Amino acid sequence: MLMENLEYDVLLEKFKKILREGGLKYTKQREVLLKTLYHSDTHYTPESLYMEIKQAEPDSNVGIATVYRTLNLLEEAEMVTSLSLDSAGKKYELSNKPHHDHMICKVCGKIIEFENPIIERQQSLIANEHHFKLTGHLMQLYGICSDCNHKTKVKI
């Protein structure tokens, strides 16, 4: 289910429903986590999300285990998407944006989001060519960003 541009209250109701269906309680700590994701364009590791919450809302009493459990639940419910970053683990973002792909710098970890209608069309053509019903995809391109390229003099 794609949740493009949902208003926060609609997103929160969906979140509460998913928690109920998963046999979990709605808590203020979980809402703080959802609100933090909603109001940010950052791709978070569980640890960086935890630190962001602790810094922004020190009285929220959110534990790292709650962050991990809630992110897993949100990912299963397709409310967040994750990017696999090899040994660095996963980074998460809320799924309420229009579809986009990612370029990930292998040096600094910078993530650049992009949209390209030609790539999207080509993927559909390839799927049709193989009689494959495309329901979604996640594209991650790895390389070296321009900042790191200038610093290390690596040729792209």
UniProtKB/Swiss-Prot annotation:
Please explain the role this protein plays, according to its UniProt record. Acts as a global negative controlling element, employing Fe(2+) as a cofactor to bind the operator of the repressed genes.
What is this protein identified as?
Answer: Ferric uptake regulation protein
Mind listing the UniProt keywords for this protein, alphabetically? Cytoplasm, DNA-binding, Iron, Metal-binding, Repressor, Transcription, Transcription regulation, Zinc
The similarity annotation says:
Belongs to the Fur family.
Segments of this protein annotated with the region Dimerization: 97-156
User: What GO annotations for molecular function exist for this entry?
Assistant: DNA-binding transcription factor activity; transcription cis-regulatory region binding; zinc ion binding
The record, for CDD domains, names:
Fur_like
Q: Which organism is it from?
A: Campylobacter upsaliensis
Q: Which GO terms describe its biological process?
A: negative regulation of DNA-templated transcription; negative regulation of siderophore biosynthetic process
Q: Where in the cell is it found?
A: Cytoplasm
**Top-rank taxon, per record:** Bacteria
InterPro entries assigned to the protein according to its UniProt record, in alphabetical order: FUR, Fur_C, WH-like_DNA-bd_sf, WH_DNA-bd_sf
For the ligand (Fe cation), the binding residues are H99, D101, E120, H137
Higher taxonomy = Bacteria, Pseudomonadati, Campylobacterota, Epsilonproteobacteria, Campylobacterales
From the UniProt entry, list the residue stretches annotated as the region DNA-binding: 1-96
Span-the-membrane segments of this chain are none
Binding-site list for Zn(2+): H43, E93, H102, C105, C108, E113
Which gene codes for it?
fur
Q: Give the quaternary structure.
A: Homodimer.
* Gene Ontology CC terms: cytosol
Pfam families noted in UniProt = FUR (PF01475)
